[in-house]
Amino acid sequence: MSPIVKTDYSLYLVTDRSLLNGKDLMESIEAAIKGGVSIVQLREKQATSAVFYETALALKKLTDQYQIPLIINDRLDIALAVDAAGLHIGPDDLPIKKARELLGPHKTLGYSAATLAEALEAESLGANYLGVGALFPTKTKKDTESVSLQLLQKIKSSVSIPIVGIGGISQGNASQVIQSGADGIAVVSAILSKQYPEIAAKNLYLKTQNK
């Protein structure tokens, strides 16, 4: 069930327009990619389907230009419509088995897991990677369960697919996440809320290399 190309999950950017403080979304993402972001997830919880689709199309062109994967949050239809690299879902979304069936065997399927049981089930049903968190307090998602670094280590040792730590990750704690066994870190505000996303991404990328 693995994608044909091995994916680099080191620095995983999840988008959130509300953090841009007047900056342009595409320009900020491009700057972050130049700084070391290796994969981008488009998350548009407030957008209409039309806006989500148009944004995804534009972002697909950008990520293709830099040869990095575009993952779509939640919306299987958008992921298929723009031929994104994959889809990311969680416990409240489409069941993993059905998502995998509709997505096909060669697209990347990510799943948000907050327990060992969720992680094991997701792997068994076809997930290619796991987003594990929230590891630290976060303002970008209100409905998250808290996950300890010890649990992240336990999940990492129990599954064979990559693990991406998420939730309140910043320059100050990124190294802890990597040293706990995560294959990468997923960040939102640590890049997008900053005045210079490229510099923020570069500093975080350096943290991911200290394994």
Curated annotation (Swiss-Prot):
CDD domains membership = TMP_TenI (cd00564)
- A Pfam family per the record: TMP-TENI
Residues that bind 4-amino-2-methyl-5-(diphosphooxymethyl)pyrimidine, according to the entry? Q41, L42, R43, E44, K45, N73, S112, K141
List the catalytic activities from the record. 2-[(2R,5Z)-2-carboxy-4-methylthiazol-5(2H)-ylidene]ethyl phosphate + 4-amino-2-methyl-5-(diphosphooxymethyl)pyrimidine + 2 H(+) = thiamine phosphate + CO2 + diphosphate; 2-(2-carboxy-4-methylthiazol-5-yl)ethyl phosphate + 4-amino-2-methyl-5-(diphosphooxymethyl)pyrimidine + 2 H(+) = thiamine phosphate + CO2 + diphosphate; 4-methyl-5-(2-phosphooxyethyl)-thiazole + 4-amino-2-methyl-5-(diphosphooxymethyl)pyrimidine + H(+) = thiamine phosphate + diphosphate
EC main class here is transferase
Binding sites annotated in the UniProt record for Mg(2+)? D74, D93
Which InterPro entries does this one have?
Answer: Aldolase_TIM, ThiamineP_synth_sf, ThiamineP_synth_TenI, TMP_synthase
Task: Check the record and name the SUPFAM superfamilies matching this protein.
Answer: Thiamin phosphate synthase
Q: Which cofactor does it need?
A: Mg(2+)
One Gene Ontology term of the molecular function aspect: thiamine-phosphate diphosphorylase activity
Give the EC number.
Answer: 2.5.1.3
Q: Which GO terms describe its biological process?
A: thiamine biosynthetic process; thiamine diphosphate biosynthetic process
Residues binding 2-[(2R,5Z)-2-carboxy-4-methylthiazol-5(2H)-ylidene]ethyl phosphate: T138, K139, T140, G168, V188, S189
What GO cellular-component annotations does this UniProt entry give?
A: cytoplasm
What is the documented function of this protein? Condenses 4-methyl-5-(beta-hydroxyethyl)thiazole monophosphate (THZ-P) and 2-methyl-4-amino-5-hydroxymethyl pyrimidine pyrophosphate (HMP-PP) to form thiamine monophosphate (TMP).
The protein's matches in NCBIfam families, at most eight in alphabetical order, are given as: thiE
The name under which this protein is listed is Thiamine-phosphate synthase
Q: Which gene encodes it?
A: thiE
